[in-house]
């Protein structure tokens, strides 16, 4: 019986790019190669319009499972390759149709003749291929408007591709084409989703997490490491910077009026993150803020917090409600990690009545009474940095190291 030999990848949004399209295609190819590292027999050919993945005996389901998380892929089809002869095409179409899983009652045939010298025209091929499927199946009908399955045939010189198992990719742009940002990763539900959506726009991310021992636990720190690890499903790696924040928070609690302590804390986080961004050649800062969700996420608060950085602040969740954010968190695998009951530094010294309309002038006046610069310098200098990769890649590297 014929088996799937290829996966044909369609780019989606990348097709709108002009002269720099080759850069996008090259980056996507590199990302796919990295994602499929554990499949040594695979061959990848990336053209201007699509990507061809030759399986060479590798399990198509296992490969598909990893492909679906690669940004830059709009859709992909499992494909069979047959000689460009009518009988081979008919048998290939039937074999592909029979491998489709689920309750299938209707189908249609779509033919694209890239090879214009093929002796039959498209309108002649449609009844030939469709009739062959009808003759060899039961309780199946043709529906050209809303079929359960679309059997696609691409005829080329010498060979043809047969496809009907179409799967959705992650969409967006390949990670790496849009520069790098620093993501404030708190450990809650929102910030991992913000990181995910930032990566979807082709941007590489490094994460910054503020922890305040002994007020925050090692389990809270591990939760953030696990979140960063989960995000590596969608990129090559995530660099995580763990910033000690205890002394900064204790000083804020002592020196700043409680109503402004949350605002000043966020401003200090921005200052520290900007310093790390400069070190790491990042171009922006991403946060998980959603407008009006909590006191520190009003327009007034954001206006006051933004004052302390010259970097663009990207807020992918700004117009989403909590249920929308939770839905994405569940889909990308971060929700169950985020709801582990371990407190982060944002819950330490929480004021009873935080200002919802803080003013820049007041924040500056309160901060001017104490020199926070040495504390910021110390926090940046004492940060712990770790590089996280997908579990499969780490296992392969460890296996390689054991050989020596």
UniProtKB/Swiss-Prot annotation:
Purpose of the protein: Catalyzes the ATP-dependent transfer of a sulfur to tRNA to produce 4-thiouridine in position 8 of tRNAs, which functions as a near-UV photosensor. Also catalyzes the transfer of sulfur to the sulfur carrier protein ThiS, forming ThiS-thiocarboxylate. This is a step in the synthesis of thiazole, in the thiamine biosynthesis pathway. The sulfur is donated as persulfide by IscS.
Species in which this protein is naturally found: Bacillus cereus (strain ATCC 14579 / DSM 31 / CCUG 7414 / JCM 2152 / NBRC 15305 / NCIMB 9373 / NCTC 2599 / NRRL B-3711)
Gene Ontology annotations for the cellular component aspect, listed alphabetically: cytosol
The protein's name in its UniProt record: Probable tRNA sulfurtransferase
Pathway(s) it belongs to: Cofactor biosynthesis; thiamine diphosphate biosynthesis
Domain THUMP: 61-166
Keyword list, A-Z: ATP-binding, Cytoplasm, Nucleotide-binding, RNA-binding, Thiamine biosynthesis, Transferase, tRNA-binding
InterPro entries: Rossmann-like_a/b/a_fold (IPR014729), ThiI_AANH (IPR020536), ThiI_fer (IPR054173), ThiI_N (IPR049961), THUMP_dom (IPR004114), THUMP_ThiI (IPR049962), tRNA_STrfase (IPR003720), tRNA_sulfurtransferase_ThiI (IPR050102)
């Amino acid at each position: 019986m014929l088996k799937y030999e290829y996966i044909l990848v369609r780019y989606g949004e990348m097709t709108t790019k002009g002269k720099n399209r080759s850069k996008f295609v090259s980056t996507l190819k590199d990302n796919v190669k990295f994602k499929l590292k554990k499949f040594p027999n695979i061959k990848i050919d990336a053209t201007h319009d699509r990507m061809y993945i030759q399986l060479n005996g590798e399990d198509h389901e296992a490969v598909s499972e990893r492909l679906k998380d690669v940004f830059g892929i709009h859709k992909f089809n499992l494909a069979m390759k047959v000689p460009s002869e009518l009988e081979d095409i008919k048998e290939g179409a039937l074999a592909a149709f029979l491998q489709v899983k689920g309750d299938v009652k209707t189908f249609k045939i779509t033919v694209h003749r890239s090879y214009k010298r093929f002796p039959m025209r498209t309108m002649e091929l449609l009844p030939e291929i469709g009739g062959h499927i009808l003759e060899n199946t039961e309780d199946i009908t043709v529906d050209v408007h809303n079929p359960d399955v679309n059997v696609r045939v691409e005829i080329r010189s010498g060979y043809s591709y047969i496809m009907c198992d179409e799967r959705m990719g992650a969409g967006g742009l390949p990670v790496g084409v849009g520069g790098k940002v620093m993501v404030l990763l708190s450990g809650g539900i929102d910030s991992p989703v913000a990181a995910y959506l930032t990566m979807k726009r082709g941007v590489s991310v490094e994460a910054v997490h503020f922890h305040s021992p002994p007020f925050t636990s090692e389990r809270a720190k591990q939760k953030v490491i696990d979140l960063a690890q989960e995000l590596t499903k969608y990129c090559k790696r995530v660099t995580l910077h763990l910033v000690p924040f205890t002394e900064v928070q204790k000083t804020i609690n002592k020196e700043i009026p409680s109503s402004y302590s949350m605002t000043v804390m966020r401003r200090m986080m921005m200052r520290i993150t900007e310093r790390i961004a400069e070190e790491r050649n990042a171009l922006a800062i991403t946060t998980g803020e959603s407008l009006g969700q909590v006191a520190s996420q009003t327009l007034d608060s954001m206006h006051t917090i933004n004052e302390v950085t010259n970097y663009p602040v990207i807020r992918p969740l700004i117009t989403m409600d909590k249920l929308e954010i939770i839905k994405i968190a569940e889909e990308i695998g971060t929700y169950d990690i985020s709801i582990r009951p371990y407190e982060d530094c944002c819950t330490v010294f929480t004021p009873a009545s935080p200002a919802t309309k803080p003013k820049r002038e007041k924040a500056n006046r309160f901060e001017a009474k104490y020199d926070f610069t040495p504390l910021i310098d110390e926090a940046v200098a004492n940060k712990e940095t770790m590089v996280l990769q997908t579990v499969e890649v780490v296992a392969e590297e460890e296996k390689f190291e054991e050989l020596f």
